[in-house]
């Protein structure tokens, strides 16, 4: 019995890791069809990013690894912090406030259910 896995990664997406993790927690460990259903009915920016990434991981599993798409489930969802864009907002009396535009690195790993 071999535990083959398929992976898809997207880096430097303009969404904060904290907001992306809210969506990632919704479908971790679920079957692929259930996960897509959850993401399609979630009204968050991160859900659209995860839909693209999940479809890419499914394509990798079926085309590159010869896995059965109906048996796939989401084994691992990682949301790591990417590089931060630092900007400044001018304020009164010569001050400036820092603005951090955070980015995320997203990763999904799929496996077949036995």
Swiss-Prot record:
GO molecular function: rRNA binding; structural constituent of ribosome
Entry keyword set: Ribonucleoprotein, Ribosomal protein, RNA-binding, rRNA-binding
GO cellular component: cytosolic large ribosomal subunit
One Pfam assignment: Ribosomal_L22
Zinc among keywords: no
Biological process terms in GO annotation: translation
Quaternary assembly: Part of the 50S ribosomal subunit.
Assigned protein family: Belongs to the universal ribosomal protein uL22 family.
Function comment: This protein binds specifically to 23S rRNA; its binding is stimulated by other ribosomal proteins, e.g. L4, L17, and L20. It is important during the early stages of 50S assembly. It makes multiple contacts with different domains of the 23S rRNA in the assembled 50S subunit and ribosome. The globular domain of the protein is located near the polypeptide exit tunnel on the outside of the subunit, while an extended beta-hairpin is found that lines the wall of the exit tunnel in the center of the 70S ribosome.
HAMAP family for this protein: Ribosomal_uL22_B (MF_01331_B)
Protein name per its UniProtKB record: Large ribosomal subunit protein uL22
């Amino acid at each position: 019995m071999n535990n083959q896995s398929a992976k898809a990664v997207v880096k430097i997406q303009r969404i904060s890791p904290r907001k992306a993790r809210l969506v990632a927690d919704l479908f971790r460990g679920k079957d692929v069809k259930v996960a897509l259903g959850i993401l399609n009915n979630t009204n968050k920016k991160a859900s659209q990013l995860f839909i693209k990434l999940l479809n890419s991981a499914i394509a990798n599993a079926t085309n590159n690894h010869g896995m059965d798409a109906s048996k796939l489930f989401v084994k691992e969802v990682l949301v790591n912090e990417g590089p931060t864009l630092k900007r400044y907002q001018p304020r009164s009396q010569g001050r400036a406030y820092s603005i951090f535009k955070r980015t995320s690195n997203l990763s999904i790993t799929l496996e077949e259910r036995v």
